[in-house]
């Protein structure tokens, strides 16, 4: 059943009614809510989901939704508001999973500093072998994790009812089981919007072939910095390869976004990133690319406290320098979303109060990673 578009004053999110997030720890309504120890075929009738839906239908904001509330207050948008837009502001009261966020495995060739063991087997290995790093992450029982085989089978068997399939990882382009799933969709020309989040390090020609053959394949490229800075923030990056793939996708993909996680590590690397993304947006515009007059979208996730990599978790000296850098960013040729985000980050950093404990936690984390990986994160602040 579909009701009228919900009023702005209502707290409504469509995801608990149409979406399932699946990773190695369970199933959830979205990536920001607690995982439940059920399989996909049990999810739609689970007591947890039913209670969550009832709270939303009564116009109440569930406590697990506070992250979106904070994002909306600070930056004017969130996963919830993006999802409302994606579903054309419809208000559902029944449950039919037509959108699966499928995070099949933590196999990944990168070890990004803002990531965690559940999404990178390399980080899982570091956490298991280092007592300092173990304090920052939930340590996994094994280095490599994958979602239950029953969930994989459910996804394959229910492709007919799925309208959108989001595939992340880990790095999906390095997972044979993901390639098999996408091959079926592409070669059978199924009517599914396939959204793959990638670090753009792929070398298998299949992904270029799929991009050419299947117009409903959407790429989200994770870019948090460019050049040598990218190789620190997103360890494992070979920038020349990533840049080549991003430029190729910008001209050949039917749909591509760039996603940036903003932390206290890359807050002073945003200007060169924004400049590079502007080039990619130019290359992706029609007729050179396939993204109309505006080019591909650049979206952001801004890290918040109490996370130790929160964008405003800076020493006083670095806070002052970050403010100057962000002001410089605002002089660049930015699109509306970029400008809004930079204004929001600038306001957040300007209003931040120094937290010595949280800052020290960030220092210890990054210094230990420098030692393990032979890097120097302080160069990110030069």
Predicted segments with their positions:
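Acidic (Asp/Glu)-rich catalytic clusters
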Residues: 209-216, 250, 278-281
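Short pre-active-site segment immediately N-terminal to redox-active cysteine/selenocysteine motifs
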Residues: 64, 72, 107-111, 116-119
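Recognition helices and adjacent regulatory flanks at domain boundaries
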Residues: 75-99, 108-110
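Catalytic cores of alpha/beta
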Residues: 264-280
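Accessory C-terminal segments flanking Radical SAM cores
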Residues: 2-84, 302-382
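Core AdoMet radical
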Residues: 97-107, 116-149, 160-176, 188-206, ...
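Alpha-helical packing segments of well-folded alpha/beta enzyme cores
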Residues: 64, 151, 158, 181, ...
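Distinct, well-ordered alpha-helical segments
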Residues: 177-183, 205-211, 269-273
């Amino acid at each position: 059943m579909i009701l009228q578009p919900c009023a702005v004053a209502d707290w409504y999110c469509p995801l608990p009614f149409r979406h399932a997030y699946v990773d190695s720890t369970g199933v959830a309504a979205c990536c920001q809510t607690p995982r439940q120890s059920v399989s996909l075929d049990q999810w739609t009738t689970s007591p947890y989901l039913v209670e969550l839906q009832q709270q939303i239908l009564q116009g109440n904001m569930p406590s697990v939704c506070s992250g979106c509330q904070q994002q909306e207050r600070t930056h004017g948008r969130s996963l919830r508001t993006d999802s409302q837009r994606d579903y054309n502001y419809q208000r559902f009261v029944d449950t039919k999973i037509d959108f699966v966020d499928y995070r099949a495995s933590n196999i990944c060739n990168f070890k990004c500093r803002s990531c965690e063991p559940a999404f990178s087997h390399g980080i899982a290995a570091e956490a298991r072998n280092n007592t300092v790093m173990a304090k920052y992450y939930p340590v996994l029982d094994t280095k490599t994790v994958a979602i239950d085989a029953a969930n994989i089978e459910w996804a394959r068997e229910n492709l007919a009812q799925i309208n959108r399939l989001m595939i992340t990882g880990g790095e999906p382009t390095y997972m044979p089981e993901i390639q098999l799933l996408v091959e079926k969709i592409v070669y059978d020309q199924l009517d599914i919007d396939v959204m793959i989040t990638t670090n753009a390090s792929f070398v298998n020609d299949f992904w270029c072939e799929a991009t050419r053959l299947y117009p409903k394949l959407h790429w989200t490229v994770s870019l948090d910095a460019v050049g040598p800075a990218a190789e620190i923030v997103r360890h494992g990056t070979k920038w020349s390869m990533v840049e080549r793939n991003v430029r190729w996708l910008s001209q050949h993909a039917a749909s591509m976004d760039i996603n940036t996680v903003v932390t206290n590590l890359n807050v002073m690397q945003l200007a060169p990133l924004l400049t590079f993304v502007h080039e990619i947006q130019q290359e992706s515009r029609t007729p050179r690319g396939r993204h109309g007059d505006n080019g591909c979208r650049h979206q952001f996730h801004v890290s918040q406290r109490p996370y130790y990599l929160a964008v405003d978790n800076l020493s006083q000296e670095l806070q002052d320098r970050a403010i100057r850098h962000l002001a410089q960013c605002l002089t660049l040729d930015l699109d509306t979303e970029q400008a809004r985000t930079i204004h929001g980050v600038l306001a957040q950093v300007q209003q931040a109060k120094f937290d010595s404990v949280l800052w020290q936690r960030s220092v210890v984390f990054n210094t230990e990673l420098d030692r393990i990986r032979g890097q120097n994160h302080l160069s990110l602040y030069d």
